[in-house]
Amino acid sequence: MTLTKHTKRLIHAHAKICYPAECCGLIIDGQYYPCDNVAPNPAEHFEIDYLNMVEMQEYHGEIQAIVHSHPNGNAEPSEVDKVQMGLHDIDWVIVGLGHTPTGATYCDIKRHKPTTYQSPLLGREYYHGVQDCYSLVQDYYSRDLDIHLPDFHRTDGWWEKEHHLPLYENNFT
């Protein structure tokens, strides 16, 4: 997959519109498709609705890359990005967009190939559902004990909802 100047312009324009929140989108058959960021805190993370991804793939073809921006950051993957890239096993395009101390705007767009990445057990970046307390336990059991615990979707704050299903009980029995 090649990032054309036209595609980069579309991604840059979308990142500017979404700023200071993270933009996100998909590249399918060389075309950029902006997506809504449905993350609980879009200024710090991005999330593309899974059903939206499936629908886009049905109508437009195979996803070639996942795109998102790092407002006031660089175009290098964060620790959470590295974990996710390995799980999705497709390219990621990251946009660093912001302002320099002199007030000038900068934009850097880079494509990254997926690699297998394991976060350190200590000092890892926290993000619920990706690198949270449960994923720490999963990683420890997998690396040190060769026991593979199941993964399951968990929304942030589920434990505060009175009538929420007991995730751990339901997923371990």
Please annotate each region the language model reported.
Residues 128-144:
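Active-site nucleophilic cysteine motif
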Residues 113-121:
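Eukaryote-biased recognition of intrinsically disordered, low-complexity regulatory segments
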Residues 88, 144-145:
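Residues at alpha-helix termini
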Residues 20, 145-146:
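Residue-level recognition of short, structured coil/turn motifs
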Residues 146-158:
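Short acidic alpha-helical/loop segments enriched in Asp/Glu that coordinate divalent cations
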Residues 156-173:
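...with weaker cross-activation on analogous glycine-rich loops/strands in unrelated enzymes
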Residues 1-65, 72-114:
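Conserved beta-strand-loop surface patch within small alpha/beta domains used
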